[in-house]
């Protein structure tokens, strides 16, 4: 993930970007995060049924022991993200709000959750970004040294002031 310019952020957003201009709060790991994911997974399955081809808890809240922005990141795979009529109306009826459309980045869509701090990342099944996100999650779950390094880097980056709340860069992205 690279840092985005103001123009790129505005182009991907549905509605105006929310200006943050602050540091990022990282909460200590909370086992409630996995329960919140399970509740959202049930809501998504109820809305999409067999159109939800994959639903996974991703991001820092999915890694036991890791501090995180208290936002549940969920990966949803559908048959084709560009066929929005196949899933967007059902997700909106379930209370989710489509906030980001990124045709130039894996045809990514992002919904915000209805009553929980959720980032629902939607990709087409088979997208390499799904594999990357889940590999990273699984690696952090199994490698304590890398999890500690990642946590320390996140804590350092969280102390910076960020205009937008976006994914913080990895250490080699500055």
Regions found by a protein language model. Give the residues of each.
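Charged phosphate-binding loop/patch that engages nucleotide di/tri-phosphates or the phosphate backbone
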Residues: 159-174
